[in-house]
């Protein structure tokens, strides 16, 4: 449907304009496109040229709508920029296809940016198409195109044209998404990203610096569940194939007057829909009812008063953040920080961010240029207003009593009746007054300190005394959590930059950071869109702080300022086990000796949790991605958000809230909500098989005729005495201790047996894996989830979430997978 509409648009333009022979749409191998020259598409719809913004010498290469389609007064901007983050500082820029077929942007004779690095000595040309797509093509001898080597549609900037995609490539895992500009005349990558959700593929989201800012809701039957996009003419189609999953924007193809609908995300995170009309002008459909929800950004942000003055730096009474911040970021960070009283941009173009924790003083030197300072004052006005209300109540009370006294005298109420009525009136007035004072006090505290009360309650639950926080410059030996300020975390991660992002899990994104003392840390930030919440955060913070073992990851502290909830861990240089185990190249690092050592470490960590720690802990989410590896490839168990503490005599419990990862959950936990130490044993058995085989447990789901999962695959080969066939191919050519490998396979199958009672304990696993006592291993029984090649899982009734209740009946009401 979308492609038909685009074809009609192109055909209409062709008939209207005809083709010009005086301009070219092609750059041949060895030719140069320089500043002042243009490539113009065949029917003059788009042009490619170098340009710069007013009052800036920086040179950019971009694709524009041609002038024929714009009013002369139109404030136009390019739809695509090749070097948005790498501007050329002078006018010497040029574009060329070199002798090896590589597409390059040059500064003088030097390579500034290599857009395509695929080498070919064949005939290669660059062509600007009438769709707005810039393609590097390898040509056959007869002049026909052989293949596309590179195209601009695979690298969108802030604008979506018909034919472009939002989603990911199934083969390369490359993501197609829009990223806002940093400022009006600064096209560098900004703070807002519009694209497909990383976890739920049929949802579009806008992220602000990695945080959920807006969501379209689920795509179902050609519509999003949130009506915002549907009602405003944002028409999409969804494609899901083996080669990728993506949304394609089509616009309103039923409107015969319009064509080339575009979507642009601006610097404030607002989606703008624009369409070109046959009257040869562009109309901006910026309707406030159609904007993506999030921060509301005004010329003067809410809660701030602007002043243009020369002020001194905040170095002594605040902090300065990197130049990659926009004014939107700066105001949002100030609002999130209860100690922030003012902010300003550090650069003339409106980027950078300077925060004051005390009011800025007008002591700038004469050499400093005036800046617009935004001072936070709205909340103080509200607090002052509430003070007036309190004073008014105190003044009104005696006046009310005096009026009552006069009324009683007028009606000749005397003696005991007068006293009784007066006492009742005084009592009611006092109750009312105290109630109002209590309410006003809470209101004032809320306005002054934001979520301070909630923070205090959370600190108490974590066992932390706030009075000692500012005195504690070093971590104590009593396992207390260190409290980090939001500013210190921002500084450590360079404002949660993409370069420092290590990955993302069910909790939220994880970043690498560097503290002021030089120590490297990993920072786990609770996402607002995360399925995990405050309970899991507290659970993990408390548990890891109290558990100390060489095979458990160490938590250093947390940050709970305002709405932020972050955990700070020791940094693991080698990421997680799945990073190596399931990658066809990186898995070669894991020889059998190292794999066995990793299994040993996991066993020791689980044995400590189940038997030897101060607390008896069931992890409930043992999997490859939760096994971190330090610089010496020693394994450490992480992610205790779902862990549960058992009493000394407690052996099992049940829950109405089943949470974990499909493929690793034991059958009794998956079906009935029952969990125990044997649940972790099952998960470990699955992980053992993955380590031995080098495959994910669910890697068979595409094979409808084959086994259900890795467990069933190994079980079938075990019954046929073909265990050697399950061993990872990367291990088969190396020197293997086959008896040890076969023993590990058998131990793993014992761990994944259907009945929990049949599975060994982790203490038994230790003796089994080393073959202590020279006892032969028992034969494993049928594994879980095995019933022929395919088996349907029992239906789950999903109801609203209820709190866990250990004494409740065994019924699953909520199923959460991660």
Curated annotation (Swiss-Prot):
GO aspect biological process, one term: signal transduction
Organism the protein comes from: Arabidopsis thaliana (Mouse-ear cress)
Leader sequence segment: 1-22
Official protein name in the record: G-type lectin S-receptor-like serine/threonine-protein kinase At1g67520
Residue positions, PTM Phosphothreonine: 655, 813
Subcellular location: Cell membrane
Segments on the Extracellular face: 23-387
Residues that carry a glycan: 123, 199, 337
Record-annotated disulphide pairs: 330-353, 334-340
Keyword Endoplasmic reticulum recorded: no
Domain Bulb-type lectin per the UniProt entry, residue ranges: 24-149
PROSITE patterns: BULB_LECTIN (PS50927), PROTEIN_KINASE_DOM (PS50011), PROTEIN_KINASE_ST (PS00108)
């Amino acid at each position: 449907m979308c492609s038909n509409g685009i074809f009609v648009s192109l055909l209409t333009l062709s008939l209207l304009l005809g083709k010009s022979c005086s301009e070219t749409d092609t750059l041949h191998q060895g030719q140069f496109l320089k500043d002042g020259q243009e490539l113009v598409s065949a029917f003059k719809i788009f042009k490619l040229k170098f340009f710069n913004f007013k009052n800036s010498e920086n040179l950019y290469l971009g694709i524009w709508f041609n002038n024929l389609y714009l009013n002369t007064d139109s404030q136009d901007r390019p739809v695509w920029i090749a070097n948005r983050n790498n501007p050329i500082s002078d006018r010497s820029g040029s574009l060329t296809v070199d002798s090896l077929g590589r597409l390059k942007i040059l500064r003088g004779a030097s390579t500034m940016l290599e857009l395509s690095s695929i080498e070919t000595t064949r005939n290669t040309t660059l062509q600007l198409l009438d769709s707005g797509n810039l393609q590097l093509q390898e040509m056959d001898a007869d002049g026909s195109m052989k293949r596309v080597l590179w195209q601009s549609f695979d690298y969108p900037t802030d604008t979506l044209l018909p034919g472009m995609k939002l989603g990911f490539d199934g083969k390369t895992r490359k993501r197609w998404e829009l990223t806002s500009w940093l400022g009006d005349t600064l096209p560098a990558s900004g703070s807002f990203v519009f694209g497909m959700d990383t976890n739920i593929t049929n949802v579009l989201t806008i992220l602000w610096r990695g945080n959920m800012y807006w969501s379209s809701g689920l795509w179902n039957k050609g519509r999003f569940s949130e009506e915002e996009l549907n009602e405003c003419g944002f028409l999409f189609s969804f494609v899901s194939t083996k080669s990728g999953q993506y949304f394609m924007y089509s616009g309103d193809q039923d409107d015969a007057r319009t064509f080339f609908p575009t979507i642009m995300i601006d610097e404030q995170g607002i989606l703008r829909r624009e369409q070109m009309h046959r009257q040869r002008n562009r109309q901006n459909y910026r309707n406030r009812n159609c904007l993506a929800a999030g921060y509301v950004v005004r010329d003067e942000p809410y809660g701030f008063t602007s002043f243009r003055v020369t002020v001194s730096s905040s170095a002594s009474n605040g902090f300065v953040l990197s130049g990659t911040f926009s004014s939107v970021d700066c105001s949002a960070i100030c609002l999130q920080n209860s100690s922030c009283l003012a902010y300003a941009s550090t650069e003339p173009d409106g980027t950078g961010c300077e925060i004051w924790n005390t009011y800025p003083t007008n002591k700038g030197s004469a050499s400093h240029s005036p800046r617009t300072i935004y001072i936070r004052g709205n909340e103080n006005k509200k607090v002052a207003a509430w003070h007036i209300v309190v004073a008014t109540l105190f003044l009104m009370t005696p006046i009310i009593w005096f009026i009552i006294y006069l009324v009683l005298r007028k009606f000749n109420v005397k003696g005991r009746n007068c006293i009784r009525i007066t006492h009742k009136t005084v009592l009611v007035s006092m109750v009312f007054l105290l109630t109002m004072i209590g309410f006003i006090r809470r209101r004032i505290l809320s306005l002054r300190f934001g979520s301070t009360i909630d923070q205090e309650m959370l600190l108490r639950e974590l066992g932390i005394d706030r009075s000692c926080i500012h005195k504690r410059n070093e971590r104590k030996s009593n396992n207390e959590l260190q409290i980090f300020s939001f500013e210190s975390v921002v500084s450590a991660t360079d404002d949660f930059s993409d370069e420092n992002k290590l990955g993302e899990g069910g909790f939220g994104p994880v970043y690498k950071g560097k503290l002021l003392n030089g120590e490297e840390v990993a920072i786990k930030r609770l996402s607002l869109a995360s399925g995990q919440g405050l309970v899991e955060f507290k659970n993990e913070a408390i548990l890891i702080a109290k558990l100390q073992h060489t095979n458990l990851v160490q938590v250093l502290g947390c940050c709970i300022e305002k709405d932020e909830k972050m955990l700070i861990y020791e940094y693991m240089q080698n990421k997680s086990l799945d990073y190596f185990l399931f990658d066809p190249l990186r898995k070669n690092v894991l020889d059998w000796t190292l794999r066995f050592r990793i299994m040993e470490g996991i066993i020791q960590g689980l044995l400590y949790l189940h038997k030897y720690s101060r607390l008896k802990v069931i992890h409930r989410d043992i999997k490859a991605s939760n096994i971190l590896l330090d610089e010496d490839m020693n394994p450490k168990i992480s992610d205790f958000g779902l862990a549960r503490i058992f009493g000394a005599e407690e052996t099992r419990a049940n829950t109405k809230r089943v949470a974990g990862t499909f493929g690793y959950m034991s059958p009794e936990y998956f079906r009935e909500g029952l969990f125990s130490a044997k649940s972790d044993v099952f998960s470990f058995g699955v992980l053992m098989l993955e380590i031995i085989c080098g495959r994910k447990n669910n890697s068979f789901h595409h094979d409808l005729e084959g086994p259900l999962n890795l467990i069933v695959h190994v079980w079938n080969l075990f019954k046929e005495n073909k265990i050697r066939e399950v061993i990872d191919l990367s291990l088969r050519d190396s020197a293997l201790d086959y008896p040890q490998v076969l023993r590990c396979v058998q131990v793993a199958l014992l761990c994944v047996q259907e009945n929990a009672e049949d599975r060994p304990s982790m203490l038994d696993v230790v003796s089994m894996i080393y073959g202590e006592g020279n006892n032969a291993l028992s034969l494993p029984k049928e594994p879980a989830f095995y019933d022929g090649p395919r088996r349907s899982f029992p239906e789950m009734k999903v109801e609203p979430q209820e709190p866990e209740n250990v004494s409740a009946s065994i019924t699953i009401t909520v199923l959460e997978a991660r």
